[in-house]
Amino acid sequence: MTLQTYNDLTTAIGNWLQRSDLGALLPNFVQLFEACANRRLRVRQQEATAELTPGNGVVALPSDYLGWRRLTWTGNPRQELGYVEPSWLQAAYPDLPTDIPRVFTIEGGNILTMPLDPGNTALELVYFQQIPSLAANSTNWLMSQHPDLYLFGALTEAQAYTLNAETAALWKARRDELFEEIEKLSNKTRGPGAVRVLSPTP
């Protein structure tokens, strides 16, 4: 059978497990794998762009944010902001000056920029986006391009639940191989000199 949708995946998991009593738990296995994938993957298919409007140098991160790649002030001329640690930002700008923002940091669920922009010009954030939930969307880019990762990832979670350590280790090894292959492919398809990631998730 093909593996293209959420229903295809849960059917395949049930077939591979050969355990009819686990049907109600199949969505949990998929969800647990997606949580794992969101912690692990940072590839180009996850990149998204959001326009954010700050207020007094503060703006909330997107709800599906995993990590940043670039933050740009969209005034004229556009200016890319540099990342600094929160403690550095506070120490360097104690008087809260106003000017074109030059640096930013992340505290909690917010981006903080300095100097403060009196015009509250929009910021363009290029960031890594969470993998869209397969249960909520039927399919997504990861399922379309790498259904084997979804299958072996969910099987790993299922075998952990059944306390089958030997089989869980087998599927986990295959899952991790696929993670590495996808990460290498993402780097390769960016092109030479374009593989640098500016920062992990703060």
Question: How does the language model describe each region?
Answer:
Residues M1-P202:
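Glycine-enriched, solvent-exposed interface loops adjoining structured elements
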